């Protein structure tokens, strides 16, 4: 029997502070819950939306009930007895970090049980010897930044100076990351990518998870805007991924949409589709759901929930994007084939109402739909790897080293 799996990952869509949130300074974080609360209290009204958060399709898959199980509180405005068509769980992260790579890798069988390298100092974040090596190897004449920063704020602060000097802007965050921002036209995209590749080679031995190229356009601080030509240079996964097993054992197709391929350092990816906006990600995903061959795993990362709304602490924008996605989800559900398994999940939290601009350590929703799947609560997962293990079980693959199968089809005991 030919099967397909569709994984829709809403980047940063946590559903409540996890049991170890205190260790990360994230007690009280609740991405879904706090957005729903703001909407319910009319604090997220705009020209595009108003009132309670309206996510009927996500609710039918068990989103609200998943949050209720995780936090003992139903998100405000949600139905305690929705017309449930999906099975649902919530998951605690096993990995030692709350970043994108840790969440994604764990999901596909490679949890991070070691410590990434970090640049913890808020200012003068990068050691002098590293900066000296970068300048020597890349031949750049100077740099700007060298601090923790929001990507949108730092180009406002330093973008004009960058245009004067053409020095790249270096910055980081609480994640294991080295980000480089340059003007796409004045500095050049190819030159940026080449710089990032060289910096990645320098930082890889230090277990810095990613070097990220961030280009922007505009003429001054009032109109600088990041482009969609982001590129992530990631360390290769330390364990075999579900993708590789699928290709080896079933000659499957692994279809990356958005930044999935970059996150997994292109390991086990057979097809790649880029998209520059939430609308484009939805369009490309729907197209692949309609047209991708059987024996495929379609995996989309909806990055804009995180990059445009979570990190920017934009509750209204996040709520509006969720409602847009939910409307598209109806079309995706209607386009599924007889033996498709749909999974919706997240990789961490990024509560737009929380202090700071960093990710938040939260439980994630695990929502599953298949025509023969019993619509019920699947329990608490102790690792995101339960998602990958469930996919392996569904596709008839060798089991992963981590995680348990959550699937319980109708007629099974």
From Swiss-Prot:
Pathway: Carbohydrate degradation; 2-deoxy-D-ribose 1-phosphate degradation; D-glyceraldehyde 3-phosphate and acetaldehyde from 2-deoxy-alpha-D-ribose 1-phosphate: step 1/2. It holds the Pfam family Metalloenzyme. One of its GO terms (molecular function) is magnesium ion binding. Gene3D superfamilies: Alkaline Phosphatase, subunit A, Phosphopentomutase. It catalyses: 2-deoxy-alpha-D-ribose 1-phosphate = 2-deoxy-D-ribose 5-phosphate; alpha-D-ribose 1-phosphate = D-ribose 5-phosphate. The keyword Aminoacyl-tRNA synthetase does not apply. The keyword NADP does not apply. Mn(2+) 2 binds at residues 306, 311, 359. Keywords: Cytoplasm, Isomerase, Manganese, Metal-binding. GO terms for cellular component: cytosol. InterPro entries: Alkaline_phosphatase_core_sf, DeoB, Metalloenzyme, Phosphopentomutase_DeoB_cap_sf. One of its GO terms (biological process) is 5-phosphoribose 1-diphosphate biosynthetic process. Mn(2+) 1 binds at residues 11, 347-348. SUPFAM superfamilies: Alkaline phosphatase-like, DeoB insert domain-like. This is Phosphopentomutase.
């Amino acid at each position: 029997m030919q099967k397909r799996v569709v994984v829709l990952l809403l980047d940063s869509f946590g559903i409540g502070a996890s049991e170890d949130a205190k260790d990360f300074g994230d007690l009280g974080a609740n991405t879904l819950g706090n957005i729903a609360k703001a909407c319910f209290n009319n604090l997220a009204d705009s020209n595009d939306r108003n009132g309670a958060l309206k996510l009927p399709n996500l609710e039918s898959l068990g989103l609200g009930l998943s949050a209720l199980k995780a936090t003992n509180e139903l998100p405000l405005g949600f139905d305690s007895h929705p017309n449930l068509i999906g099975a649902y769980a919530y998951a605690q992260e096993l990995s030692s970090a709350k970043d994108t790579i840790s969440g994604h890798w764990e999901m596909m069988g490679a949890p991070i049980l070691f410590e990434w390298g970090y640049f913890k100092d808020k200012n003068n974040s990068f050691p002098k010897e590293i900066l000296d090596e970068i300048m020597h190897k890349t031949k750049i004449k100077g740099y700007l930044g060298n601090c923790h920063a929001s990507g949108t704020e730092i180009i406002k602060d330093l973008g004009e100076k960058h245009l004067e000097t053409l020095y790249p802007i270096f910055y980081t965050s609480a994640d294991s990351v080295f980000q480089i921002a340059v003007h796409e036209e004045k500095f050049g995209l190819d030159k940026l990518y080449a710089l990032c590749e060289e910096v990645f080679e320098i930082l890889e031995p230090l277990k810095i998870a990613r070097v990220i190229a961030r280009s922007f356009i505009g003429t001054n601080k009032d109109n600088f805007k990041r482009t969609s030509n982001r590129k992530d240079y990631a360390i290769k996964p330390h364990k075999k991924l579900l993708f590789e097993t699928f290709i080896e054992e079933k000659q499957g197709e692994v279809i990356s949409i958005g930044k999935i391929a970059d996150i997994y350092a292109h390991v086990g990816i057979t097809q790649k589709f880029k998209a520059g906006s939430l609308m484009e990600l939805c369009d490309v995903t729907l197209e692949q759901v309609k047209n991708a061959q059987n024996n495929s795993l379609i995996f989309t990362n909806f990055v804009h929930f995180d990059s445009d709304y979570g990190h920017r602490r934009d509750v209204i924008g996040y709520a509006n994007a969720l409602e847009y996605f939910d409307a598209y989800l109806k079309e995706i559900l209607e386009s599924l084939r007889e033996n498709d398994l749909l999974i919706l999940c997240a990789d961490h939290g990024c509560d737009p109402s929380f202090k700071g601009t960093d990710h938040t350590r939260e439980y994630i929703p695990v929502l599953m739909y298949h025509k023969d799947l019993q619509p019920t609560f699947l329990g608490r997962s102790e690792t995101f790897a339960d998602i990958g293990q469930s996919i392996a079980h569904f596709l008839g693959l060798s089991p992963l080293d981590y995680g348990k199968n959550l699937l319980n089809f109708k007629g099974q005991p």
